Amino acid sequence: MSTEQFVLPDLLESCPLKDATNPYYKEAAAESRAWINGYDIFTDRKRAEFIQGQNELLCSHVYWYAGREQLRTTCDFVNLLFVVDEVSDEQNGKGARETGQVFFKAMKYPDWDDGSILAKVTKEFMARFTRLAGPRNTKRFIDLCESYTACVGEEAELRERSELLDLASYIPLRRQNSAVLLCFALVEYILGIDLADEVYEDEMFMKAYWAACDQVCWANDIYSYDMEQSKGLAGNNIVSILMNENGTNLQETADYIGERCGEFVSDYISAKSQISPSLGPEALQFIDFVGYWMIGNIEWCFETPRYFGSRHLEIKETRVVHLRPKEVPEGLSSEDCIESDDE
């Protein structure tokens, strides 16, 4: 196999869960896209990437059971995450931490406002979320947001130093900076439940939780690797971490990721079957619906041009990825996004 191409693992084969889409997708997606575009945050190129990425379609797959209002809220959140992610990818460690602080403070403190677009967008999302979210769910969501922003800053610092972590250090970082855990927290919001903190201390519950999270993170990394290497952003990717740590080539690494993703799914199914009924039906319901992230994310990755460009449907069939050349970077208007009115 040429080093200029590789074959993706067949993650659909290893994930027996059934995919579905949300009937409210078109309306919720259009409203959310208009909302975020109304702030004129993106350069022309970034706006095109935003539209092509179809973040709202991801929500339709992974939250297929959500009501109309709840789906709109999840679409707003993944679009907000796109803004934070795209801004921080263009920044050094200091800049990414400043962006993260704006995001976190606007999320946590209702009366805090630095006048920036990011703060305004974040506060508008939070007003929608807290209207229906329970108090424990809200607190966990904000705590996860703090961890997410810290890890996004750490990712930028690692990128600035051209430093690759070892696998043991990368996994906890990726669990947080991927925002998957924040997206899992939205499951409680959608279902209208507010799990006790003790549920998140249960061994089998957390084993299923982490297995689902890792499957989503590793799958996303193998699918996004070509796009990220073309942008010079592959340092925060399990593919680069494993090749560096294990001395394997790209194809060997892709094959290994496929094996591990299959194991994550098996671990999730096994742990879910062992969750004690004493945790209550809502705990099992939550874990059930978290699982749809594993299959929904896979389907979405092939359904849009975000990772594979115009050949995304062909690549779903052949699984052959031809590596793209490095891009000439064009920034997103990050200064406008985080600059306050007072400056």
From Swiss-Prot:
The entry's Mg(2+) 3-binding residues are 220, 224, 228
pH-linked activity: Optimum pH is 7.0.
| Keyword Transmembrane on entry | no
- Under Enzyme Commission nomenclature, its number is 4.2.3.-, 4.2.3.127, 4.2.3.128, 4.2.3.129
GO terms in the biological process aspect are: isoprenoid biosynthetic process
Instruction: Spell out the reaction equation it catalyses.
Output: (2E,6E)-farnesyl diphosphate + H2O = cubebol + diphosphate; (2E,6E)-farnesyl diphosphate = beta-copaene + diphosphate; (2E,6E)-farnesyl diphosphate = delta-cadinene + diphosphate; (2E,6E)-farnesyl diphosphate = germacrene D + diphosphate
Positions occupied by motif DDXXD motif: 85-89
Q: Name one Pfam family in it.
A: Terpene_syn_C_2
Biological role stated in the UniProt entry: Terpene cyclase that catalyzes the cyclization of farnesyl diphosphate (FPP) to various sesquiterpenes, including cubebol as the major product and beta-copaene, delta-cadinene, germacrene D, germacrene D-4-ol, sativene, tau-muurolol, beta-cubebene and beta-elemene as minor compounds, along with minute amounts of further sesquiterpenoids.
Protein name stated in the entry: Cubebol synthase cubA
- Designated gene of the protein: cubA
